[in-house]
Amino acid sequence: MDKSIPKATAKRLSLYYRIFKRFNTDGIEKASSKQIADALGIDSATVRRDFSYFGELGRRGFGYDVKKLMNFFAEILNDHSTTNVMLVGCGNIGRALLHYRFHDRNKMQISMAFDLDSNDLVGKTTEDGIPVYGISTINDHLIDSDIETAILTVPSTEAQEVADILVKAGIKGILSFSPVHLTLPKDIIVQYVDLTSELQTLLYFMNQQQ
């Protein structure tokens, strides 16, 4: 992907993909920027600006070809082939994610999970067929795998140490649910999911409306 694309635009790519998949399922062949914008709750100028980073995706007055754009975003997001990811941390959030069927919506799947060697799940397989291993064996299990992405759901006090282990094992991208900033090499991509912060932000905006 072109590194000059703004982060805000990049974060909307999966949303565009989801919308075009829905349009396709509904039998819609052409969609205007307004239809797309209304479906996402943004303005049509933002849609047109986002799409402009990728060249000529549609013709003015004719709308956007739904199937073409669906395939276009699938290609950008690498959703034509299955992407295996790993999960580290089988606490409450981790266990919930182990039961979440990513592959029902996109071609992503958690193919293995890790926790402290003493965790009662280690050595077992989940109902969905995901094996759970001890964290001391990460290198052994990653060496022959195609996994480059990890979901991190460990306590904040352990996040940096575990992230360092993942990077040394060859992980290139981390989705972290731990509310601490990770200090990692610049070529490692990290996305943060801070549920507490998001809820506090929601409550703030709700209070502002009162």
UniProtKB/Swiss-Prot annotation:
It holds the Pfam family CoA_binding. GO terms for molecular function: DNA binding; DNA-binding transcription factor activity. GO terms for cellular component: cytoplasm. It comes from the Bacteria. Keywords: Cytoplasm, DNA-binding, NAD, Repressor, Transcription, Transcription regulation. Disulfide bonds: none annotated. GO terms for biological process: negative regulation of DNA-templated transcription; response to redox state. Residues 15-54 bind DNA. The keyword Metal-binding does not apply. It is found in: Cytoplasm. InterPro entries: CoA-bd, NAD(P)-bd_dom_sf, Rex_DNA-bd_C_dom, Tscrpt_rep_Rex, WH-like_DNA-bd_sf, WH_DNA-bd_sf. NAD(+) binds at residues 89-94. Homodimer. Belongs to the transcriptional regulatory Rex family. Modulates transcription in response to changes in cellular NADH/NAD(+) redox state. NCBIfam families: PRK05472.1-1, PRK05472.1-3, PRK05472.1-5, PRK05472.2-3, PRK05472.2-4, PRK05472.2-5. PANTHER family: REDOX-SENSING TRANSCRIPTIONAL REPRESSOR REX, REDOX-SENSING TRANSCRIPTIONAL REPRESSOR REX 1. This is Redox-sensing transcriptional repressor Rex. It comes from Streptococcus agalactiae serotype V (strain ATCC BAA-611 / 2603 V/R). The gene is rex.
